[in-house]
Amino acid sequence: MRHHRTVLPLAGYTIQQIDFDPATFQPEDLFWLPYHASLSGWGRKRQAEHLAGRIAAAYALREVGEKRLPAIGDQRQPLWPTPWFGSISHCAQRALAVIADRPVGVDIERRFTPQMAAELESSIISPAEKTALLRSGLPFPLALTLAFSAKESGFKATPAANQCALGFADFQIVDITASTLALEFAEQRYPLHWIASEEQVITLCALQQ
């Protein structure tokens, strides 16, 4: 599958970005994944997205001298080789991956339009969180996209044993600035950093062990 790699530094971490062309994907492209047989029943689009994410993950692991690839869990989540933590995200024809020595989550989202923000607001944030978003001075659709993405990143950084029953309401946006956000979950503060383009936002959450 044809793809292009870009390296994005953010908050001291290196995000591997893969822009890929799903039209060039062939099923045999999956053969380099040890578990490729388990993907045979997936749709072509999903297979291409999965491959792009694992390509990004391979580059991320290579940065720390790790040759093993993430395995795949029973919920299709990546299982990172010990002692590393990692995270993968997809949006359209782009995949991201990051590796760290501590729990980490990365997320990429397409920026909400004003109409989408109006429709989705109540399912993403509480009235108190809306106050925090409005206080940031950012355009509300951008701030809401960041809130959505931050909660996704926070979820990914949360230990797997605690993820099962979590929803957006469990993570509270308490602060947002021109480059950072803060979530609260179970009396713990989750620090995040973000960057944005005209079309997308990326958030990164790294926790202390």
Briefly describe each language-model feature range:
Residues 1-209:
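Core catalytic alpha/beta fold that binds nucleotide/phospho-ligands
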